[in-house]
Structure formats: C-alpha cells, structure tokens
Amino acid sequence: GYFNPIHIGHVDYIKNASKLGDRLVVIVNNDRQVELKGSTPFMSEYDRMSIVSAIKGVHRAVLSIDADRSVVRTLGSIYDEYSVDYFFDSMVFANGGDVNSVNSREDWYCESRGIKAVYNIGGGKMQSSSSLLKASEKKRYDPYSMYEF
C-alpha cells in the first residue's frame, strides 16, 4: 500500500490481513510510485516503512522495487524468497477496501503461481489518505482553523 499518510483504515486492513496466514509481509509503495499515482509523498518511503513495520501483526515490511504502479516484481521477489522454505504451502496477496480486481498484473502473477488474491480486506474504505491530505492543506492555509472561538 501507499500509506501516504497511514490512517486507521490501513491499521484495520493490516489487522484483518494478518489473520489470513502465518506471516504478514506488507509491501510499501516507493516514493516514485506515490508520484506516479499523482500524489506527493507525505512522509518518506523509509518513514512509512518504519511505521508499518511497527504495527502489531506485521512480520515484515518490504519497500516496493517496482518502477511502475504495480507491485508485481516485489510480489515475485517475496514469493521466490518464501516458496523455497520447506514449510511453505501457500501465499495470499491481500488488498484493502479501496482496491478491486481488474485483471491487474498482480492478478496474472498470482494466478500463474497459485497465489490466492483477496480483495476488500478490512471492509469498505473507512478513511482516505487523500481526504486527510486535503484537510491538512486547508489547515495549513487557514491559520485560525485550529482555534475555536
């Protein structure tokens, strides 16, 4: 995920995704991907990784190595790393409430490797990073918005 900025919906998604398997590896989109999405990084990719890593239930956070908006190369890297483990028997690619399957590159990769793709983890969109950023912008330009009269 982008986690730009991270919010309660992300935490709920991570909590629910952690129930799908023994280990939860979270892919954090890199700063270039944030820009490709049409946004500006609210925090650096390393800050976002540190925060995600600290959330209960996260076994490991991985920074996306992809140069486009997909995470298919990163997903492949994780699969290659874990699938050689003697105890590995399956993998799930989980997405939050704001992502739906639309024959993405990730879907194709998952199907080719027998990875189960699950969407709408954590229910519908509870909060949006973009709405938080817009609210933050309003407060930045209105010095009195933080005071009640």
Language model segments and positions:
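Nucleotidyltransferase catalytic core that binds NTPs
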Residues: 1-149
